[in-house]
Amino acid sequence: DLNHDGKIDDNDKTAIGYPSYPLLNAGLTLGFEYKGFDFSMLWVGATKTSRVLEETFRKPLGETYDRSLMSHQFTDRWTPETAATAKLPRATIDGVKNNYRDSELWVKDASYLRLKNIEIGYNFRLPFMPKIGMEKMRVFMTGYNLLTFDKLKISDPESMSSGVPQYPVMRVINFGLNVSF
């Protein structure tokens, strides 16, 4: 009851959370070379940003045809038996009920820290290389999106559309060999 009139209604609305675009972005690049080895990594992150979970998360019995029923939407919902442990309001098919309105329950912290890129390599200097006209030979391993630390958990926090279910961010690991003649 934000306006202290003794009832909870539309007059008790207030702004919650942060914008969907981050108010603070950061990045850090580290790297070194030592005795033929090279290493680099890029960390990116953002904070002071929120996501409002959309209808798919709020209304598992919902009003749209693309329902991807997530088991937690039922196991974590309020029932008389789970009244003390429920994390979500009771499931209804009526979308205008108060438990589906915007509230702190549906606004999630989308701050994150991600290891966006990491690469380790080794440059060979072998006696046979000049004899065959080889200038350089390097082996390497590169990884993309290998680690993400976030509170959102249900979606990619870096995506502006993370209020809806989506395919997870792809992790990629590449191995390679560069040879120069």
Where are the predicted features?
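Repeated loop/turn-to-beta-strand initiation elements of outer-membrane beta-barrel proteins
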Residues: 36-40, 127-128
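Membrane-embedded beta-strand positions of outer-membrane beta-barrel proteins
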Residues: 41, 139-141, 177
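Membrane-embedded beta-strand positions in outer-membrane beta-barrel channels/transporters
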Residues: 27-29, 117-121, 174-176
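Conserved small-residue
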Residues: 1-20, 61, 70, 78-80
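Outer-envelope beta-barrel architecture signal
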Residues: 24-26, 35-37, 111, 133-137, ...
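C-terminal beta-signal and terminal closure region of outer-membrane beta-barrel proteins
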Residues: 67-70, 77-84, 100, 146-181
